[in-house]
Amino acid sequence: MAKEKFSRNKPHVNIGTIGHVDHGKTTLTAAISAVLSRRGLAELKDYDNIDNAPEEKERGITIATSHIEYETDNRHYAHVDCPGHADYVKNMITGAAQMDGAILVVSAADGPMPQTREHILLSRQVGVPYIVVFMNKADMVDDAELLELVEMEIRELLSSYDFPGDDTPIISGSALKALEEAKAGQDGEWSAKIMDLMAAVDSYIPTPTRDTEKDFLMPIEDVFSISGRGTVVTGRIEKGVVKVGDTIEIVGIKDTQTTTVTGVEMFRKEMDQGEAGDNVGVLLRGTKKEEVIRGMVLAKPKSITPHTDFEAEVYILNKDEGGRHTPFFNNYRPQFYVRTTDVTGSIKLADGVEMVMPGENVRITVSLIAPVALEEGTRFAIREGGKTVGSGVVSKIIK
């Protein structure tokens, strides 16, 4: 188990890779790890190690979210490799929420594709504040004008979703070539492009001002039982600080429970405390594994309460964004993805509103079938039949 203390000499930032399936997100993640490991700034993680969820092997499609860590001269990074395939947008919704910034991977050979657009939209909706672009597979494009066109197209697409397209750093390179160089023990032109990318990430994605002053809150992503030690829940601390010995509540879905923190770990290393932005495992005293499920939150006692009914501002995707082709009516019952969980709920439209068309912004009242830890400002996605149909933010709690 974790023994070494986790060092905090460098500021910590959470980033991840997003983009269309097969544009090279996982290869880029492996290339960053390989190039930085040659400089003693990362532990080498190869492609298979990152692409490691068993169910994705036969299709070569990344489903699970992999976490790797590395450093630059300036910062320490936790990097998530987000799923790219449309069927796994659910994971993107929970995964992209873990980012202070994202590296959008776009194949220079193909240009932006439907999922490129969807991931930019999702980044906008789940609050990923900064995007840096890696134009991958540049070794396959001989025409400099074509590269320029793809770059312009990417900038326009970012701007259309309210990201500053004109100011966004776009680095072109080849993740595969960089990976091959690093494996051969060389530092060539392609590895230099990876270093350029990391320099852009270092300078363009600000070190986030952490919410350490606020009340502790951590959405639960996973629950494990460790024999002889008890139950561990993992997730990214959304705000506040948790220390060994703290009394905390487990809120949402079932009745609120109170427990005590007996350990905090990050990347298998023990810490005295975890703070906002950290991906941690929290050991809970006397809590049984079956009492805790994904979608609950750990929180400072009395700081957040479970709710079923709220008002929200939502944007309903149009069909070009992958949304519905038809309107919906009063009492529509989709799923609401809040933090790490999905709960069915019914939608009540405002008086005088007959229906909602794709592409509209509306205020709705939602009634969930199970209570979830909510507060004003909590963001969520609306999903139906395996696709995102809308996105919103809680504007007022009703009950």
From Swiss-Prot:
It comes from Campylobacter jejuni subsp. jejuni serotype O:2 (strain ATCC 700819 / NCTC 11168). Its EC number is 3.6.5.3. The gene is tuf. GO terms for molecular function: GTP binding; GTPase activity; translation elongation factor activity. This is Elongation factor Tu. It comes from the Bacteria. Residues 174-176 are annotated as: G5. It catalyses: GTP + H2O = GDP + phosphate + H(+). Residues 60-64 are annotated as: G2. It is an enzyme of class 3 (hydrolase).
